[in-house]
């Protein structure tokens, strides 16, 4: 039997991971791959989740092709992306970088803020990388549900 293969992208401090791993613990034939752009976050996650022997850890830059970073096409059943895709320069290209990693019938599970948050944009907007898809974002950092569906 093939293992269920899950890829978490932009895992950061492990908030979503900490919620998911206890639920997945004990699932037979499971591989969970925690990734983040930062080696610091991947090292911290490795320490934090050391009790889960079905987890492996790697760096992954979502803005680059995953295959050029050592990831195989059509190798994951599920990709988990919690509040990370919006933080990339070009959402469409980021999604294009993730799609090839999914097995046929695989799914992308995203959690993103979908309501405009002008105060958040005002405070944190200057800290965000220069965005290249301002037309798609319509001047906001976060996309609405309808805008995500167009991606």
What are these language model-derived features?
Residues 1-151:
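4′-phosphopantetheine-dependent carrier domains
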